[in-house]
C-alpha cells in the first residue's frame, strides 16, 4: 500500500470508515477529510478529520484559525472552469495572498505532514508556505508541464 494518503470525501460520516479501509489496504499514514460541505480541508468552517497513524484511527475537528489562517466565505474559494482554475493556481503559486492561497496552504500542508516531511500539520503548512514563497512550487509546476507536454 501507499506510505501516506490525503483523501477528501463528500460526506463527513465517511471519514472514519474510509480511514479504516485505507489502513486495511496497507496505507501507513492517512488523513481522510471533509470540510464544511467540501471534500477537502476548508477555510469556510470546521473540517472533520480521521487520521490513520500506526494502525490507529483518531478523529478530530480542525479549525484553520488555529494555524493563523482566517475563515473565508464559500464564494471566496469557489473555482470555475479549467482556465479559471489554472489562473487561480498560477496566482497562488506566484505568491498572491488571499483565500485561495490559504486553502492551498492547508491542504498542501496536510499532504506534506502525511507524507512524513513535517512533524505536524503546522510544520507542513510552514513547508508549503516556504515552497510557494521561494518560487519552488511554481518551478516544479513548470517542470511538470514541460515533461508532460503541457503548457503551464
Write out the residue ranges for each language-model feature.
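Glycine-rich anion-binding loops and their surrounding alpha/beta cores
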Residues: 1-152
Amino acid at each position: 500500500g501507499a506510505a501516506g494518503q490525503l483523501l477528501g470525501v463528500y460526506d463527513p460520516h465517511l471519514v472514519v470508515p474510509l480511514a479504516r479501509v485505507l489502513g486495511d489496504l496497507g496505507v501507513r499514514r492517512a488523513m481522510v477529510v471533509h470540510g464544511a460541505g467540501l471534500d477537502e480541508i476548508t477555510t469556510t468552517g470546521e473540517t472533520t478529520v480521521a487520521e490513520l497513524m500506526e494502525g490507529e484511527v483518531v478523529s478530530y475537528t480542525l479549525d484553520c484559525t488555529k494555524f493563523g489562517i482566517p475563515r473565508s466565505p464559500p464564494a471566496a474559494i469557489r473555482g470555475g472552469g479549467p482556465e479559471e482554475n489554472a489562473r487561480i493556481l498560477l496566482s497562488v503559486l506566484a505568491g498572491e495572498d488571499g483565500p485561495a492561497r490559504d486553502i492551498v496552504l492547508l491542504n498542501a500542508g496536510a499532504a506534506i505532514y502525511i507524507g512524513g516531511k513535517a512533524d505536524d500539520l503546522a510544520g507542513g503548512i510552514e513547508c508549503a508556505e516556504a515552497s510557494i514563497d521561494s518560487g519552488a512550487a511554481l518551478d516544479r509546476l513548470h517542470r511538470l508541464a514541460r515533461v508532460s507536454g503541457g503548457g503551464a
